[in-house]
UniProtKB/Swiss-Prot annotation:
Protein's GO biological process: urea catabolic process
Gene: ureA
Keyword Transcription: no
Name of the protein this chain belongs to: Urease subunit alpha
Catalytic activity: urea + 2 H2O + H(+) = hydrogencarbonate + 2 NH4(+)
Urease beta: annotated span: 103-234
Chief location: cytoplasm
Length: 234
């Protein structure tokens, strides 16, 4: 018997689904993998029988499991199940949204529990204020943890003050500089051991005083917009 990789995957899914069905019949609460396998295997078999449409199976797939049939939190993890099933007239995608009702678990996976009080961003860190001028004809966006000293060379500002610093904004956010725009930003010291590598390779070493002089010289040589350079200082 010669089987394609896709056919082997379907057989594996069938075995997993049958195992999940037996465990459910024995009163065992299913985990994430078992729940998905049970639903998928059922849909594939019904599609192969050819007596039900895609719409029928999309609806039926939501009735196979209840929150009590799965382990706590599993229902909340399964947002949708998509199965490429073989119908008599060809392969079709059956997508089942929210196949298991979550049952209202108070501590569902991924739930965010917030404090009642406000959280101070970067508390205790001294901020440096800089005016930045975008001299380019395209917008420039800078992420929260980018070494600001090494941002786009068409942004002109006092790069010496930006050495070893990043934007004082929430992690994962960014600041956008439109063409010709002047904008004031606040920077804070980058945390950790102050070894800065990558970006535009202006530092690639410990961010100390000697490193600053060398980085400023490189920035000037490579045409980065620098105000109050100080590159020629001994």
């Amino acid at each position: 018997m010669k089987l394609t990789p896709k056919e082997l995957d379907k057989l594996m899914l069938h075995y997993a689904g049958e195992l999940a069905k037996k465990r459910k019949a024995n009163g065992v609460k299913l985990n994430y993998t078992e729940a998905v396998a049970l639903i998928s295997a059922h849909v594939m078999e019904e599609a192969r029988a050819g007596k039900k449409s895609v719409a029928d199976l999309m609806q039926e797939g939501r009735t196979l499991l209840k929150a009590d049939d799965v382990m706590p939190g599993v229902a909340h993890m399964i947002h949708e199940v998509g199965i490429e099933a073989n119908f008599p007239d060809g392969t079709k995608l059956v997508t089942i949204h929210t196949p298991v009702e979550d049952g209202g678990h108070k501590l569902a996976p991924g739930e965010v529990i917030l404090k009642n009080e406000d959280i101070t961003l970067n508390a205790g860190k001294q901020a440096t204020t800089l005016e930045v001028h975008n001299k380019g004809d395209r917008p420039v966006q800078v992420g929260s943890h980018f070494h600001f000293f090494e941002v786009n060379k068409l942004l002109e500002f006092d790069r010496e003050k930006a050495y070893g610093k990043r934007l004082d904004i929430a992690s994962g956010t960014a600041v956008r500089f439109e063409p010709g725009e002047k904008k004031t930003v606040e920077l804070i010291q980058i945390g950790g051991n102050q070894r800065i590598y990558g970006f535009n390779s202006l530092v690639d070493r410990q961010a100390d005083t000697d490193g600053k002089k060398l980085a400023l010289k490189r920035a000037k040589e490579h045409g980065f917009g620098v105000v109050n350079c100080g590159c020629d200082k001994k």
